[in-house]
Amino acid sequence: MAKFDLKDDSVVVVIGSGAGGGTLGSQLAQHGIRTVIMEAGGRHEIEDFANDEWGMFGKISWLDKRTTSGNWRVAKDFSGLPAWIVKAVGGSTIHWAGASLRFQEHEWKVRTHYGNIPGANLLDWPIDANEMAPWYAKAEDNLGVTRTNGIPGLPGNNNFKIMKAGADKLGYKECHTGRMAINSEPRHGRGSCQQLGFCFQGCKTGAKWSTLYVDIPI
């Protein structure tokens, strides 16, 4: 492991190795900038993941109550349960669902679109869809987002098929399995989704994009 002088201002220090920190640190390093990524949690490899909800929750979650504020909780039956934040290399890219949607046109300019709504502080973004389009495209290629860059969509499970039948009957013009950062076919050395259903516990096939093994592999 490389060592750096604490007074060396040429070294970039990135806090966290999730979607933001892991991606930024990887890009900086690949462009020749000496970079250190600091991560509070340990490193788990794909073979460490298990199809066990509670087992993996205990292994990868950050259970420190200081990570949340206030007394609101998602579930009343586990009132002391903090927000689900992963404390490990890869951060929440280990347990995210993989949904990768672009902002719709009106979402960039919500103040203009919806007007001045009493009690709400809506603001327009200083950027728009056209400006972000090439960056979206670059991210979608790196993440392997389905239905972009010629990548086919994921197959629908039985639940989806029932929902789609209803959507078709109601006249919906578009209903599909979404744009997901999960390989629908082998790509860049990683396999395709096996429909195991344990995306939140870490992808055992590596089909789902995570900074853990895509951007900061050993």
Model-derived features: where do they sit?
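N-terminal glycine-rich phosphate/pyrophosphate-binding loop and immediately adjacent elements
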Residues: 2-116, 121-130
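Conserved redox-cofactor binding core of oxidoreductases
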Residues: 75-76, 104-107, 112-218
